[in-house]
Amino acid sequence: MSKTMILAIGGAGCNMAETIMRVANAHWVKEATYLFADSDMERLSELGKKGFETLNLLRDSDSFPTDKLKGVEKLYILAGLGGVTGSKFAVIAAKSAKSDGVGNVVLIVTLPFIFEGTGKMANASEALKSLSDIPVKVLNNEDLTERYPDLNFIDAFEYSDKEALNAMESGLI
């Protein structure tokens, strides 16, 4: 097992990880251990059929199975904040990893679009506040339409995923 793990949480996190796996240049990113965690069983089943390790997150749970993190020295957590799965479990996983001795925990998260509503933005803000002691790279989805006005949403998300990868490969986070 690689000493670097990329933990994808929720739909947005899983999408980011799939893009990163496809376009990564750095050897360590390609060779990292990937774990896809979500509450969407259908999505996990699809990922499992592709040969990826998956973890079913029970929405009513307040814990993360840290046995999955044994031997990990650097943990990147990818998640979209705003929804239940990403906002809740990115925080739980990060805090569990820190308390279980993972030396370097970094989160790369997206913030919701304004049109998704104030509830999702409030969830995202609350999650960010509780992560104040952990390095976080924030990618704001609202900026996608400004930065890439000629791209459709799918392509704009891929650009955002590549920004996450660039931050990882550059060692800035």
Predicted regions and their residues:
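Tubulin/FtsZ superfamily GTPase core signature
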Residues: 1-173
